[in-house]
């Protein structure tokens, strides 16, 4: 048993003012038949076995005020693995060792985020829960028990950036929370920004640029799918009483990220970092809209940039960024050497001039994001892929044997488009795994 409360599902569990504008602390007593384990989003204060009823009894406490959408609990036959003094992972029996290896960088991510924000991780412990394959929800930043999809267990730590995203929420989203769902970007745009700062620190700045390019491509695709005139393509949409999940897309994530990158380029990285630090310090434990960030930003601009402050403040067109539909008018320019390498190898395959040995070696050495950029380029040019090229891709790069589910997914879409009958059993097995 497990929960998913974001955006407005907590009201189905118990009577609650189910709005992110309202935060509260809580203390919970749980019971579950032994040998099952019950976890609740908080710090376990006590636990014991009631021998009369054969029930495992636990007391959990959440001392930091949180909104209802972050309430989470799970019960099942679980095992725990320790990553560091404050980080660990819960899984179904048999997956724990694999998960500990996959998420071994969790502590590094926390330390980098603490340095960037100049603010400690306040939640005491950071535990992950690997969900069952029957509910492979990408990631949910529930305090003290972050839920993640089992698809992250690729075996090579190639999907750890998802953990970076959820850890970043410990500051942007969980400490400082969007006041309402039209300000969802205050959670997710800020968190994408921080996720990429973490990846930049661990994997290099060019990886941040590559992720930004891929994110922009996904943003444009989502906006076109929704329709350029759709209300939900605004950074701050009016849901009109509808379920916020009805308008879910990459818009609050990627358009929000691009707005922050635009501001960072305008005032400089060091100044922007100071804005983020002041923002977290001032509004921790609170629910805010964008005006809270705007206030901190403009105050710092006046303090640090003095003579140029009015000119810079006037350059930031908040109404345009927040309420303009469609693709952002301001084009953020990102350049990535990794993207060029990925597209170059893809072109070699399309022109049938790849060196088999070098191609496999290069592909194996790439990070998942670079591999996905390679496959995205092929997908965009799939009209150029003939039967021979498709077989070369499969045989020379061992794409069907890749442990990463995103790589397999992208490859199988190409294989289906090219009617590769030999891949049908692999595709069926992949689909069955997602259903189990």
Predicted regions and their residues:
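Acidic/His-enriched low-complexity segments
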Residues: 1-124, 248-250, 267
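Generic recognition of flexible, low-complexity loop/linker segments
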Residues: 14-16, 115, 134, 246-248, ...
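Divalent metal-coordination and catalytic microenvironments
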Residues: 28, 148, 411
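Hydrophobic pocket-lining residues within nucleotide cofactor-binding pockets
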Residues: 36, 65, 152-153, 416
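Generic domain-boundary/flexible-linker signal
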Residues: 39, 137-139, 422
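Hydrophobic alpha-helical and helix-loop surface patches within well-folded domains
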Residues: 60, 89-353
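Beta/coil-rich, acidic/histidine-enriched accessory regions frequently appended to metallopeptidases
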Residues: 281-435
